[in-house]
Amino acid sequence: MIDRSLIVFFTACYPTAEKTVEFMLTAAESGADVIELGVPFSDPVADGKTIQESYVRALRNFRVERVFEIAKAFRAESDKPLVLMSYYNPIYRRGVESFVEKAYSSGIDAMLVVDLPYDEAGDFVEVCSRTGMKNVFLAAPNTPEDRLRAMDELSAFVYLVSTYGVTGERDRISPLAFEALKRAKGICRKPVAVGFGVSKADHVRQLISAGADGVVVGSAFVRLINEKGERATEDIRALTENLRSGLV
């Protein structure tokens, strides 16, 4: 699913469902290899202020069915891989099997459930396996080797968190990220993507040069939408192209 890939995150229904589709397609056309679509949630413990703000705004006129509508509209125009990022509660409330089946039929390729540890994900993974949905699991810099190997077995790719804490833009990539990446690449057989704090072309260049198979950029895009609202399309195009230059 990923190989020297730029993965770009957007919040579903922010500022509207229609604009989310437009922003996703713009990023895909401008150099994003994978699109990550976030399901708004009222208690996003892994996310920093920028993405939290987008969730608060998106939830004002939100229903989960719109996530599937966004995915379907995107899939009609693009064959780029689509990863759905969600907390477990919205999935549980709809019903795990119903949610996964609907997501898959809408064109979503993989799901990342932020607050579902791999060792508690057996039933969820089983439903995904029956449906055809791929899984992505989060790994921290200090995830024990045995857990990392188990995640690797279950994941389409491993999403390595670059540092401790929450999502958000940072001035530089922590030395811890490079240490964690080297360790993960020595253990995992699946691709490893690095996220949390990646926001500049130089960050992308450094991480890809260090062996990352992909980089995830979220807060930088969401910040543009926070600032520009529905007028963010061309800024999204420019940022995607700039980040893409870091892969060369």
Curated annotation (Swiss-Prot):
Pathway named in the protein's UniProt entry: Amino-acid biosynthesis; L-tryptophan biosynthesis; L-tryptophan from chorismate: step 5/5
Keyword Nucleus: no
Keyword Amino-acid biosynthesis: yes
First and last residue of the signal peptide: none
GO cellular component terms given for this protein: cytosol
Molecular function in Gene Ontology: tryptophan synthase activity
Intrachain S-S bonds: none
Gene3D superfamilies: Aldolase class I
The entry's keywords: Amino-acid biosynthesis, Aromatic amino acid biosynthesis, Lyase, Tryptophan biosynthesis
EC number of the protein: 4.2.1.20
Record field: catalytic activity: (1S,2R)-1-C-(indol-3-yl)glycerol 3-phosphate + L-serine = D-glyceraldehyde 3-phosphate + L-tryptophan + H2O
Protein name: Tryptophan synthase alpha chain
Source organism of this protein record: Archaeoglobus fulgidus (strain ATCC 49558 / DSM 4304 / JCM 9628 / NBRC 100126 / VC-16)
Top-level taxonomy: Archaea, Methanobacteriati, Methanobacteriota, Archaeoglobi, Archaeoglobales
Gene: trpA
